[in-house]
Regions:
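Charged regulatory segments coupled to nucleotide-binding catalytic modules in large multidomain enzymes
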Residues: 21, 29-202
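ATP-binding catalytic core of ATPases
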Residues: 1-3
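N-terminal non-catalytic structural scaffold regions of very large proteins
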Residues: 5-30
Length: 202
């Protein structure tokens, strides 16, 4: 889909942390003329959840996790002087988009750096989006101003390994938490998958 939205004489180009839109704000690079588009990594991961809400209705909802990575030509040095790609105009742009894009109903709540993201400069070259529907608002702790998903953020650096008790296997820990606190289960399941994808990309 084209991302430029015309308003009168102005054109507003969207910020696209995944860098999949041809008309993202960094493309093309004015400095290098390179096409600033990332590649999708693998398939979109779908995490299905089923729960009963406060009204007693059974709700089924799927969280989608999309990962992207800058192709090698964007990460390679540029020009005769072998300028570091991170020092280019688009390198600066992608650095400002380091984080996981949390999207609710097609609108970004926040670009979260709460997940397993350290100061390694290579983090600028990937993008991850977590997309969910409003029926998960309470479970994920969406704030009234729709700027964060606090319950998800609170476990963002966790994995299922952190919840194993005694000699529990990871499978047993998942089942126990799911039975004890389903909201926590959903948040940990998402965080675990996101951090696994970050680790595999890096």
């Amino acid at each position: 889909a084209e991302g430029v939205e015309p308003r009168g004489e102005w054109q507003f180009t969207p910020n696209d942390p995944l860098y999949l839109l041809k008309d993202n704000a960094a493309n093309p690079s004015k400095q290098t003329k390179r096409e600033v588009l990332f590649d999708k990594v693998g398939i979109v991961k779908e995490l299905p959840f089923k729960f009963v809400n406060e009204e007693g209705d059974t709700i089924e909802s799927t969280v989608k996790i999309t990962s992207t990575m800058a192709p090698r030509e964007l990460r390679d040095p540029y020009g005769p002087s072998a300028m570091n790609a991170g020092s280019t105009d688009y390198g600066t742009h992608v650095r400002k988009n380091i984080g996981v894009s949390i999207v609710r109903a097609n609108r970004e709540l926040t670009l979260s750096t709460s997940f397993a993201i350290d100061k390694e400069k290579r983090h600028r070259w990937w993008g991850i989006q977590v997309e969910f529907s409003p029926e998960l608002d309470e479970i994920l702790g969406v704030t009234n101003n729709k700027q964060d998903a606090e319950n998800l953020s609170s476990v963002a650096r966790r994995s299922w390994d952190d919840y194993q008790e005694g000699n529990e296997t990871q499978v047993q820990a998942r089942k126990r938490v799911r039975d004890e606190n389903y909201s926590q289960f959903v948040c940990i399941e998402i965080a675990h998958e996101v951090n696994k994808q970050i680790s595999s990309i890096m």
